[in-house]
Amino acid sequence: CRRCRVTSPPTTLPKARTLVLARDDRWAGPLCDGLDKVGWRTATCRGIGAALVALQDLGIEVAIVDLTENAAEGFAAAARMKAAYAPRRLPVLALGDPDGSGEGGPFDLIMRPPVHPTQIALRLESLARAAVTEEEFDLRAQTLAERGKRLEPPKVEQGPLQILTVGEPAPKFLALSHALRACGAETTGAFTSYTAFDYLHERSFDAVVLWAGQGQAEALSIAAGMRRNTRLFHIPTMLYLHSGSDIGPNEAYDRGITDLATGDTPADETARRVVALARTHRREAAIRRALEKARGSGLMDAATGLFTRDLFAAHLARLSTAMHARHRPLSVAVLRISESPELGLMRSEGWLDRAIPQIGSMIGRLVRAEDTVARLAPDVFALAFPAANQEAARVAAERIGAVIACTAFDAGPGRTPFSITFDLGAAELEPGETAAHALERAGSRASARRAS
């Protein structure tokens, strides 16, 4: 963890993603060491002067402010950092809750120490994504405005947040349910995975809390199952562990977990974190609905509702400029439907053309709200992933391909449904490279995989 004092500018740390503002290392030191190990590299500043310099010089995505020593100073510093970061959006997490209210002011989330780096890492991921989503909405509105179309502002659904709690009625889990209701949320309890999925398919929820109890297997299985379903894919999930349990952030993320909490964490704080996840989900859902309305603009691909080749090229150029200005990565992926004798027959008989709208719709639902999907050619799709590296883009593309490969498409009366697979490639925009060239590299990698 790199330390930067207010009397001098911070030492350059190109890979730093997290700015930590703390007077000492009582909580910040161990937290930074842990975040460094799980991929959220940190730069620590002792005062607001150095923090403002760091925001300009480093590729910072989120900030953490220690409130345990001087809360008033921390609140003022957070407000100044957000203002200095504009028009970019800077998520700021507070470490400490001096008045016990959990109310954030300039903070996007407040957590009480001690906190495990895994918990922080997962929340940072969610906060950073939310910021990128808001920025992407603005960028997409600009792209459409150039073509005379107005993108209506998102309309967030009103009413109590709907939370599904899944697991045995253990005392600490029941306490969390009570705390959620005290926060104004409505909770629905499911004791088994079967009941949980019945509820998930029948009703809409803003977040799901999974009680691990004495074992994590069933809870992780539910989360993984949600990530394989296009309708449930984006619902945030919190894994509530019993005291003494642990799980690595990579494993948690791979299994579909959005956040972690343990029985050692006060129920009211865990409830506030669940509510924050649920609110973010509602906001993202509203943005997604607003973006989907653009399908009726006459600018999108008629069959799939996705971006056309030309519209995607224009937006990708704007996105590339924005990501460069924000010191964020930008990656692209190409998905090309794989050829096979069976698919050739389906193509010749017109069944593939009939499946294309469903395929395009599935791809559109399986990406994040901030990602852009286009149909470049009859059987070629492209995706743009802001604030994502090449590996993240590749993994996302492979997940999309895996879900669609499990889908049965109609081949006509009395015939066995057919399936499709993709040749895929991903590329991260390199310094000085155009977005179009990066897309060509991704396409070449997809072609190479087909040839192999």
Task: Give the label of every model feature segment.
Residues 289-308:
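Amphipathic HAMP/coiled-coil signal-transducing linker helices
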Residues 115-124, 128, 265-274, 278:
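C-terminal output helix
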Residues 73-76, 94-111, 118, 221, ...:
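Alpha4 helix (beta4-alpha4-beta5 surface) of REC/receiver domains from two-component response regulators
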Residues 48, 61-88, 92, 96-99, ...:
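Conserved phosphotransfer microenvironments
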Residues 375, 380, 384-386, 412-443:
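A short glycine-enriched loop-to-beta-strand structural element that forms part of the catalytic core
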